[in-house]
């Protein structure tokens, strides 16, 4: 877990040193949160294969406070679009219990970068709908080394999926947070 340029630098340096001392292939190191990184840090994460795992709902809920407390650096709060531009897989999470596990609100926040007051922050850090959906499905599975079993619907996988009442890729954007889960399936069985 690291939030802000100084802690993020510490994690990047530690991972770089660990890999230098004991090289491993396909380790998929993560930095949970990874808010407010510099462009240089994003480049280093891409180089080292470090995957940031931000919580886009926090942009909606807390960016106003970040502007008040930290100033313009709040524009870089959870910059998923910058990660994608650097070739880093975009993985998203909720940070329960700090915020509710509302996937569709989080996707909307990552796409719109809109705060609770309606302010748009760091528009260049936004991602598109497909990237947001992949951030909660296959990319999340990959960062956990579980893409062989979950993250997409394919023959041979566990058949873990949800049925929702609309299409997150085509629904009117401001209706995205209103989508509802109608069924959850685990291992090919409704639960």
Show where each model-derived region lies.
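Histidine-centered catalytic micro-motifs
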Residues: 1-5
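Unchanged
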Residues: 176
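His/Asp/Glu-enriched, well-ordered alpha-helical/loop segment
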Residues: 6-29, 33-34, 40-43, 47-50, ...
